[in-house]
Amino acid sequence: MKIRHLLLLAGLVSAPAIVAAQQTALPSSSAAQASGDDDGGLTGSVSDESEWQDLGIAIPSFPTNASVPTAAEGGTTEALGRNVARVVFNDLKNNGLFKPVGPDALPAIAFPQVAAPAFDAWRGRSAEMLVQGFVKANEDGRLTVGCYLYDVALGSELARQGYVVKPEEWRRAAHKCADMVYSRLSGESPFFDSKIAYIAETGPKDRRRKQLAIMDSDGANHRFITNGQATALTPRYSPDYSQIVYLSYLNGAPRIYIYNIGTGQQKLVTSSTNPTFAPRWSPDGKWILYSMSVAGNTDIYRVSVNGGASTRLTDSPGIDVGGSYSPDGSRIVFESDRSGSQQLYVMNADGSNQKRISFFGGRAATPEWSPRGDQIAFTHLGGNFRIAVTDPSGGNMRFLTDSWQDEAPTWSPNGRIVQFFRTERGSGKTGIWQVDLTGRNERKLNTPVDGSDPAWGPVLP
């Protein structure tokens, strides 16, 4: 989308505000309608993945009722239909739960077949589930994208949704289609229609240029927010997606700023001249946790997003940083070296009842509480840097990655996937990676430059 203006003083560019994707009703298909509790013959769970990874899903190109020019990628509604199906295919392939087959390996279907599938033909291709849809140009210039999910074996319709979007927002319709399929088959909350903030890195490893950037969950629609004149670090989306809090060396010292996605404006979180860093949002979006160094001592503080006086939550002789709220806002996990090495601690939201939870050897840093509330992801330091998870009491710790230097985990909106950044040994090049909770499905996101400090935002409205 077109960048609207440049804020030279702050080194910022504005990001277009996200407009809610309008959902529209679709006509029912000729297939039998499955009941709401029909699981399509599946009995496994997302945690054990006993049969999910072998579930074959056919996703042919989305046809159009009439191929007409459109401002969307591809130039025509016919070409766009194939692109939409490709995005749906890639979303479902990359989450590690299913075995989809995309439009480039399947025959095209005619527009009338979208709501009247040829189930016998798809059974012959050993497809268990079928995703069909369409793209149609509206008189007002917008597009209607329809999405149907069918159980091939039962010959029934499991779900359907329609979306009305501007041509430049066509990828959102594709992600929402994939979300519908994923949620209906897995029982999990959606996460594809979301965005990621991260730090884009360029230059030699001893003089890295670090800019704030954002992109879709699959790496598309990339744009830089800051111009790189001042180093940016540790971004985090607000719970309503409207703002990003991050650390910037804009005036030479580490300070925390809140960037408004809709207006491109930013403001300081506190007026303190002391170094401030490691910002995190409260779940209700009313507070910012951050660390501040005063007279050589670093503690965790809380301040209203509207400014005002800060409240000190920790007061130890060590370095306390990296606070992350539990989903209900009642507790905070953070790292501290008060015991002599970096370890994980949990406290109540008011700073009371601080206790160490990491007793599994090595050091522990950069904790992030899962949106589900049942696990905490963190960086384990013990020879190398690995991403690990533990329950909030410090039990059931396990590693998700086994590389030289993986750090700074962030959760997908549904708590299903952990994203992090990996540094290559020797070159110092960094990249954004993600892994599911089994630790078996790992992949790298494509970014135009090196990337670090990822922050997965909420599902878009």
From Swiss-Prot:
The keyword NAD does not apply. Its main location: periplasm. InterPro entries: 6-blade_b-propeller_TolB-like, PD40, Tol-Pal_TolB, TolB_N. The keyword Signal applies. Keywords: Cell cycle, Cell division, Periplasm, Signal. One of its GO terms (biological process) is protein import. Residues 1-20 form the signal peptide. Residues 28-47 are annotated as: Disordered. It is found in: Periplasm. One of its GO terms (cellular component) is periplasmic space. Part of the Tol-Pal system, which plays a role in outer membrane invagination during cell division and is important for maintaining outer membrane integrity. Belongs to the TolB family. The Tol-Pal system is composed of five core proteins: the inner membrane proteins TolA, TolQ and TolR, the periplasmic protein TolB and the outer membrane protein Pal. They form a network linking the inner and outer membranes and the peptidoglycan layer. This is Tol-Pal system protein TolB 2.
